[in-house]
Every structure is written in C-alpha cells, then in structure tokens.
C-alpha cells in the first residue's frame, strides 16, 4: 500500500492566511524552523497507478501539482484520482470537490450523515450535479463488512464510527450522530500492511483501541497540543474537546494513548497552525521525538 500525505495541516493551513500567532508570524518571517503545510488530505493506492483520495482539501489543486502521480498525462485530459472517500463533511475536507468539478463524474464514498450534510447545509452534491454527472454517491455503511473501491481492489477498507462533532454548518451540529465522522482501517491484501487513519479523533473507546492495536501505522489527529490552545493563543474561545479533537499533552492525551499501543509507526496529521509541534526546535516537538511519534508533512510517503 502506498500512502501519500498531500496535506498535513488543519483547516486554514499553515501559515493560516489571516493569522499572526507565533507560529504563523515566524514561518512567514523565516525566524521559525518550520515547514508550511496545506490542509489535510491523503491519497492511497495498491499499485501506484490509480489513487483514492481520502478527503478533498481546499488546497487540492496545489496538492495535485506537487504529486505528479495524480496527473499521469496519458491523454489530453487525465487524472489518476479514481475515487474519493470522505471521512466527514468538514469544509476543509470536502471543499476540494468544487475544484475537481472539471473531472466529473466522481465516485464519492461517504456515510449517510455526511451525504445529508452535503445535500442540505453545504449542498455540494446538488451544485455539482450540473457538471457531467456530478458526484456519484457510494454509501459507506457503518458496522458493515469491509468494502473495496474497484480501481484499487488490493485494498480492503473498514469504516469505523468515531465520537466527534459534525461541522458548524450542519443542521445537527449539537446533536452528534454515528457517521458524522469516521476513521478508516485499510489493509493491503497482498502485503498484509495495515493503516489506521483518523484525522479527526475526539474520544477513544475500547472498541476503537482494538482497531488501532491491529494497525502497522497510525495516522491520527494531531490538531492541538493542549485542549485550551485556542484560548491561550488568543485566536478562539473553544476547547479542542468541544471541536472533536483529542489534544496531545496531559493525562488521557494522544501521547499517553499512543504510548500504550504497539504500532510500528505513530504519525500525527491535521496539525493546527497554533500547535507548537510545528516548530522543529520546540520542547513539545522534542517530547514527541522522545516518545517515537512522528509529525506528518506535505509530500511524506509511506509504504506498508
């Protein structure tokens, strides 16, 4: 299984266009040793020819340009994107579908709750129906058998319901439903390699831990270092837990969780622009290094 990190930042990217926090100001000025990042999305493939997008970032055009395998140029109009899986209906995970409209029709796998959001509160399916067949919904059923995407038959995918939040625009924002957010457990049937992918992870129960223990690689929510980070940085008033994100530090945080898992590789993705782990010289980044936890970056490649 080939995994390409197209984007590794949370919504807004890094630096965020309107943010002058320590991190954003420092990376613009060149005084902070950090790598700019686009908004989170990954691509996966069994053979490296056809690729499945997991989430469609607002930065998808730049991400395609940065990863030539997605534009193989075999004919006048071409793409290696053969399917799209949405893990939620957050704006930073689905707005890229608008940029991909010239390539419609696209097969889009998502849960019924995500499909509802994207036909009501943010009706992308409705809007794009006017472009050559638009988005063709393929239902992801929860607690069902694993599924495969025809273009990459060597990958078997399990969808796992997560405890997190629907987007702010969702009609049921304050009333969470199973399927608002999912994680993916992906297995390569040829190599046996396994990936657990959950860029938005708010709570972890024993059932979810069972999936995480089975994975060779964990690619999980790295949004915030501390739960009150937005307040401390004076850029917002919400806690990470209120937004559906488990912070890294402290009792019950992501570091403690990952320390208890046997996985060979543990990687954080969906990093918010305020998170001190973006600073390569920060004590927080050193703490991750000491625990054997990696931080995803744009252009990172993983083979399982």
From Swiss-Prot:
Entry keyword annotation includes 4Fe-4S: no
Any single GO BP term: pyrroloquinoline quinone biosynthetic process
Pathway: Cofactor biosynthesis; pyrroloquinoline quinone biosynthesis
Gene3D superfamilies given in the database record: Ribonuclease Z/Hydroxyacylglutathione hydrolase-like
Keywords on record: PQQ biosynthesis, Transport
InterPro entries linked: Metallo-B-lactamas (IPR001279), PQQ_synth_PqqB (IPR011842), RibonucZ/Hydroxyglut_hydro (IPR036866)
Disulfide cysteine pairs (residue numbers): none
Coiled-coil annotated residue ranges, if any: none
A Pfam family of this chain: Lactamase_B_2
Function, in words: May be involved in the transport of PQQ or its precursor to the periplasm.
Membership in a protein family: Belongs to the PqqB family.
Annotated NCBIfam families: PQQ_syn_pqqB (TIGR02108)
Full protein name: Coenzyme PQQ synthesis protein B
Originating species: Ectopseudomonas mendocina (strain ymp) (Pseudomonas mendocina)
Gene: pqqB
């Amino acid at each position: 299984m080939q995994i390409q990190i197209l984007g590794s930042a949370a919504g807004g990217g890094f630096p965020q266009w309107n943010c002058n926090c320590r991190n954003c100001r420092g990376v613009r000025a060149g005084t902070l040793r950090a790598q700019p990042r686009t908004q989170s999305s990954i691509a996966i493939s069994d053979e490296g020819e056809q690729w499945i997008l997991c989430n469609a970032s607002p930065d998808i055009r730049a991400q395609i340009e940065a990863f030539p395998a997605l534009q193989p140029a075999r004919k006048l109009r071409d793409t290696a994107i053969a399917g799209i899986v949405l893990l939620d209906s957050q704006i930073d995970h689905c707005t890229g579908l608008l940029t991909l409209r010239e390539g419609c029709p696209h097969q889009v796998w998502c849960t019924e709750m995500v499909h509802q959001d994207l036909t009501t509160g943010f009706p992308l399916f409705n809007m794009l129906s006017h472009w050559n067949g638009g988005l063709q919904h393929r239902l992801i059923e929860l607690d069902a058998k694993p599924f495969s995407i025809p273009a990459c038959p060597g990958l078997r995918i399990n969808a796992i319901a997560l405890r997190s939040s629907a987007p702010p625009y969702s009609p049921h924002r304050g009333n969470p439903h199973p399927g608002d957010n999912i994680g993916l457990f992906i297995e390569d049937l040829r190599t046996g390699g396994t990936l657990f992918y959950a860029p938005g992870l708010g709570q972890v129960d024993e059932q979810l831990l069972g999936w995480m223990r089975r994975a060779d690689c964990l690619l999980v929510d790295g949004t915030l270092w501390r739960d009150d980070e937005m307040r401390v940085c004076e850029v917002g008033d919400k806690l990470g837990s209120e937004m559906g994100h488990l912070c890294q530090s402290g009792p019950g945080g992501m570091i403690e969780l990952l320390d208890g898992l046997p996985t060979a590789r543990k990687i954080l993705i969906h990093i918010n622009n305020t998170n001190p782990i973006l600073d390569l010289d920060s004590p927080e980044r050193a703490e991750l290094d000491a625990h054997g936890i990696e931080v995803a970056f744009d252009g990172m490649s993983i083979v399982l």
